[in-house]
From Swiss-Prot:
Task of the protein: Component of the cytochrome c oxidase, the last enzyme in the mitochondrial electron transport chain which drives oxidative phosphorylation. The respiratory chain contains 3 multisubunit complexes succinate dehydrogenase (complex II, CII), ubiquinol-cytochrome c oxidoreductase (cytochrome b-c1 complex, complex III, CIII) and cytochrome c oxidase (complex IV, CIV), that cooperate to transfer electrons derived from NADH and succinate to molecular oxygen, creating an electrochemical gradient over the inner membrane that drives transmembrane transport and the ATP synthase.
S-S bridge residues: none
Family: Belongs to the cytochrome c oxidase subunit 3 family.
GO terms, molecular function: cytochrome-c oxidase activity
Species this protein is from: Artemia franciscana
Name of the featured protein: Cytochrome c oxidase subunit 3
Lineage: Eukaryota, Metazoa, Ecdysozoa, Arthropoda, Crustacea
């Protein structure tokens, strides 16, 4: 079948979709355990499993594209549309969280004292810093992309490194914010909507950071050419994460407070 005269890429059997699904199941199950005051070992085991699977899966895709020549013009067109539709699906995923937040905040019920935010909920001063960090990371990833198009190896590498460091710093500050919060996910609808929306965004930041780390490894090995959709997809995803955070900041942290 792989020798047929057609422009499509018939992929070989791969263990990574199944292994990634098992890791995702371990993550979600471990998160439920963690929320109910059990240990967090299963959750972090799932994270480590998925990190390894992402690394190996991207390695295979890079080999197919760079060394085996499997990504024809038709395949590249399909990959671009696949990434666009994936980001659109993620937009609607976050729309559900914003819907839940505004549904609860515009007409708070008696369970939260008919107040929004509920009493005893303190504002977060780190949110504005996180916003500036993500906006700066959007600038650095754009800088890296333009440097790549201009065949400037060093500036592209610097831009990618700065973007990854800013993403890791954002995740670190988000973790500190969660630890210092005066409420939990179990504290009323406010806690549920806050931690679900910001937590899933934080997960997307981690995924985008891993995506950019893979781009650093590929760039260091000189895999990128004038055809570098892997880098473009990472940049699209990172800008999507930036825009979602702007809406989260304006809705939950600024207007919601």
């Amino acid at each position: 079948m792989n020798q047929l005269n057609h422009p499509y890429h018939l992929v070989n059997i791969s263990p990574w979709p199944l292994a990634t699904g098992m890791g995702a199941f371990a993550m979600t199950s471990g998160l439920v355990k963690w929320f109910h005051s059990f240990d967090s070992m299963l959750f972090f085991t799932g994270i480590n499993n998925n990190h390894i699977c992402f690394d190996q899966w991207w390695r295979d895709v890079s080999r197919e594209a760079t060394f085996q020549g499997m990504h024809s013009t038709k395949v590249g067109f399909g990959l671009r549309w696949g990434m666009i539709l994936f980001i659109i699906s993620e937009v609607f995923f976050f729309v559900s969280f914003f819907w839940g937040f505004f549904h609860s905040s515009l007409s708070p019920n008696i369970e939260v004292g008919a107040l929004w935010p509920p009493s005893e909920v303190e504002s977060f001063l780190s949110a504005l810093l996180n916003t500036s960090i993500l906006l700066a990371s959007g600038v650095t990833v754009t800088w890296a992309h333009h440097a790549l198009m201009e065949n400037n190896f060093d500036q592209c590498l610097q831009g990618l490194l700065f973007t990854v460091l800013l993403g890791l710093y954002f995740s670190f500050l988000q973790g500190l914010e969660y630890m210092e919060a005066s409420f939990t996910i179990a504290d009323s609808i406010y806690g549920s909507t806050f931690f679900l929306a910001t937590g899933f965004h934080g997960l997307h930041v981690l995924i985008g950071t891993i995506f950019l780390m893979i781009c650093i490894l590929r760039h260091a090995k000189c895999y990128f050419s004038q055809h570098h959709f892997g880098f473009e997809a990472a940049a699209w995803y990172w800008h999507f994460v930036d825009v979602v955070w702007l809406f989260l900041y304006l809705s939950i942290y600024w207007w919601g407070e």
